[in-house]
Structure formats: structure tokens, C-alpha cells
Amino acid sequence: MINLQNLIRTNIRELISCAETKAEENVRDSQHIMLDANENPYNKPFNRYPSDDQIELKEELAKLKGVRTKEIFLSNGSTEAIDMCYRIFCQPKVDNVVAIEPTCELYRRYAYLNDIEYRSTLLDDDFQLNAAELLDACDKHTKLLWLCSPNTPSGNLLNVEEVEKVLKGFDGIVIIDEAYADFTRLQTFRERISEFPNMIVLNTFSKAWASAAIRLGVVYAQEAIISIFNKVSSPYHISQLTQEQGLDALKHRYDIEDWIKILLLERKRMILAFESLACCEKVYPSNANFFLAKMKEAQSVYDYLCEKGIHVRECSNVSLCGNCLRITIGSKAENAEILGLLRCYKSTK
């Protein structure tokens, strides 16, 4: 059993102890006369601050995902959630975090921004996790472990047994980024938050929910952790427009499911097509809305596509990804366009 209070930064513990609890009678209602927040009475409905607990959106999300509202925190994109993990748990210049490599670069970026030592352990050639190696990289100052499953840029799910070893073998917080989990039909760790009091699961409306523009991230964890996020978050950090668009997406979840089915079919078609391209050496298995392809001349192919107005991610400078491109699954028309161009590609050698 982890001691959550010992993991939290001292100044954050002091902030939480001083946090004011809003009395139930002071809950704001649109039917009330509200003269407490120095708002302008004109330009309704945009003159009022948004709901600070986002309860309507959380209730709909909880029903869909099979969790309680007290196990959900909504963030201004996943980036805010990542940053908050550092600010809540990691003491600058003292603590460190350990992540897998390669993975999402945001974990490293926000470690640097918060002056936290960032360590990493290399995945194997199949982009799989070795729990023992990850845990060996930890010391008494390691507060967070970062896992991403499905991972980026590789696209694969991490081995469940190895992830479980990490969760059971680490006394700090294990963060599992499941931004792309909606593209797999397998069980997610979000469904298992009751098992692991030291686990935080991240998700987002940017990927499967096709709502990147509204900047809405989701944190799932046991209530003890979520209550900390609630107490230290910025006030009114989720705009009313974002909350409304999030609710609208949830109401149209059957459309989302149809889009996912189409994307999964397109992913299968694209991978098969890439495997037959003369310029492609290998395509790695994917459980996301993208795939990683090892090319014979990645930089040349990348430049060629850019000249034609098609943007992909060049990954040659990423560990284990030499000569690789990461390709997002687009619409059928977009996918046909890139395949047509690559079939016409001429080697520069």
C-alpha cells in the first residue's frame, strides 16, 4: 500500500490543507442572482464563469466508461494533466522520473520545464517493456513512472504482465497514457483502477473522439488521487464551450464508434499496402490510429511527400526508429493519395 501523502510535494500538502471547501449552499446556479465573482451582467451566456466541477460532463463520461465521477479529473488537454503530475508529486532538483524509450516526448519536455531529472530505459526491438529494467532505473527519489500503451511512435500495446509487474513493484505513482486505447478492443487499465491505488490513467478527446480542437483530457484514478488534482487545479480551467462540445461528442458516441471501425479497416488496408511498397522495408504492428514504417530512404521519402503537400512524422532521430516514418490513418481519400504518390516514388540512390 502506498503512502500517498509522502509522495506529494511538501508545498502541495500545505496548499491542500489550506484549501477552502465550498459550502453546499454556495453552489452557483444560473437561476440565482450572482454578485459574488465580479462578472459582467451583459453578453449572456458568455459572461459567467464555467462550471468548475464539470459535473454534467463527468456524469456522462462515468456512465460510458464504467467509473465513478469521483474517479475522473478533466484537464485542459493531456498536457495539463502531464504537467500537474510533475507539480503535485515531484520536487524540483531532488526527485526524478523514469520513462520507457521511445515514447511520447511530452513527458521529457514537462520534466525539463519543472526541473525534474528525466531517466529512460530502452524498450526491446519489438518495442516491448522489460519491467525489471524499468524498476532497476529507480531510486529513493523516483516519484513517477511513465508508460504509454498503445505507445507512440511505435503504435503497439505494452505487454500487460510486464505493466502489472511495474504497478506492483513500484512504491510511487505509475502513469499509463492510454490516449490511443480507444483504437483497441482489448481491456484497458482504466477498467482496473480499483486494483491499483498508485495508478493514474490518462485519456483524451483528441484521438478517437476526433475533438483535438477543444483541448479536453481525462485523468482516471482512485478517489484519493483525483481529490488532490481537484484541489490544486487552476480555477475554471475547462471552458464552458469545451464542456459543451465534450457533452455533444458523448451524445454522438455511436458516430464515434462508426469512425473508429472505419479507421481500423483503413489501418489494416494501409499496412498491407505499405508492406507491398518498393520503398518500404517493414511495417510494425499497430493498435493505434497510426503505424510505424521502416523505409529504405526515410528522409528522402519524407522530403518527397512534403513537396507533394503531405505531412508525416519523420522518426529517424528517435531511439529504435532509424529510417522510420510514422503515418497517421487519414480519410480514405487521403490514404489513397499518399499510397498513389509512394507507388510513384523513385529512389534517389
Q: Where are the regions that the model predicts?
A:
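N-terminal "arm"/small-domain region of PLP-dependent enzymes with the aminotransferase-like
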Residues: 1-63
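Phosphate-binding glycine-rich loop
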Residues: 58-96, 114
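PLP-dependent aminotransferase class I/II
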Residues: 198-276, 282-283
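Conserved PLP-binding catalytic core of the aspartate aminotransferase-like
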Residues: 263-264, 276-308
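PLP-dependent aminotransferase-like
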Residues: 4-7, 91-147
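PLP-dependent enzyme catalytic core of the Aspartate aminotransferase-like
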Residues: 161, 307-308, 317-349
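Active-site pre-lysine segment of PLP-dependent enzymes
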Residues: 112, 129-140, 153-174, 178-208
